[in-house]
Amino acid sequence: MFLSLLLAGFLTFVELNCENMFDCRHDSLKQDYEWLPEGKRHWTPARYWRKLNNIGQEILSCQEEGVPDLVAVVEVENDSCLFDLTRRSLLRNAGYEYLMTESPDERGIDVALLYQPLTFRPICYDYLDIQPLATMNPTRDILYVEGETLSGDTLHVFIVHAPSRFGGEKHTRANRQLVADRLLAAVQLLPPAAKVIIAGDFNDDATAPALRHLENSGLHNVTATATGSQGAKGTYRYQGFWQSIDHIFVSRSLTGHVKRAFIHDAPFLLEEDKKYGGVKPFRTFNGYRYQRGFSDHLPLVVRFSF
C-alpha cells in the first residue's frame, strides 16, 4: 500500500535522442544502406546489440530507484529495434511497453514512447503527419499519446523530431516552424486545462522563432536552462560549444507539478573533448569512426509530483 501511494505521487519523464538506432537488416522502402554489415558503417549484429544495451543502460541510469515512467525516444528505425530494446536488451526486465510512429522519413527513422504499464495506461494514440513544404523532404510524424497516470491524472504527450538544420539554419527555419504550427494546432484542440507534455529533438535552441512561438502560445519550456551535474550545459556539443536542441515543454496546468528538470550527464555517458577541452557526449560514431559509445545527445529528465 505504501509503495503504491509513493508511486502515485511522482512521475519521471525522460527524453533521449538515441543517435541512429538502426537494426542491421535492409528495409526495401528506406535509405538505410549505410546501416548494414556491408555498409559504410559496417553495422554488424555485434554493434547493433552493443548499441541496444548501451541505450538500455542509459535509460536505467536516469533514475536511482526504480525506472523512469515515460521515455520519449527519437531517431529509432522501426518496431524491431524497439522490440529488441524492450524485450531482449539490458532493459528487458524493466517491463516497458511502447508506441511508435511509422513515418515517411526517407532514412526510416521514427519516434516512440516507452511507458510503464503500472504507472501509465494509454487511452488512445495517433500520428500527426507533417505535410512537407515544397523545399523539404518528408519528415518524422509527431506521436500523440493520451494516457492516465497512477494518480488518476490524464496526460497528453507529444513526441517530436523536427527537421535538421542541414543546408543552413535560416534556409531550413520554415521546416521547423511548420512542425511547431502542427503541434500548436493539435494542442489547441484539447481542453484548456489539459495536462500536456511535448518532448523531443527540436533541432533548435530555446531562443529560436519556432520555440518562442510555442512559449508565446502558453507552453513552458521546463528544460530551457537545464544543466548536468558533471558539467553539461546542453544536451549536444558541437565544436566545443554546448547546445540545447532537445526540449521538454509543459502546459500551464503542469508547470506547478514540475519538481526538477535536469540533463543526465553520468560520467560513463561522457568522454574527454581532446580538441576543444572539457567533456562531450560519448557517442556511437564520430563521423564514420566507430567509438562503441552511447549517443551524441544526453538525456533530459523531468520529475513531476502529483
Task: Tell where the protein language model's regions lie, with residue ranges.
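N-terminal, active-site-proximal structural segment of metallo-dependent hydrolase catalytic domains
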Residues: 6-93, 99-111, 181, 195, ...
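Structural recognition of the beta-strand scaffold that forms the well-ordered cores
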Residues: 12-15, 69-74, 97-100, 111-115, ...
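Active-site His/acidic residue clusters
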Residues: 29, 150, 158-172
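Second-shell loop/turn segments in exported
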Residues: 39-46, 67-73, 100-101, 131-133, ...
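Structured beta-strand-rich core segments of catalytic domains in phosphoester-bond hydrolases
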Residues: 70, 76-162
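Active-site environment of divalent metal-dependent phosphoester hydrolases
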Residues: 78-80, 106-108, 165-167, 203-209, ...
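A long, amphipathic alpha-helix that forms part
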Residues: 170-193
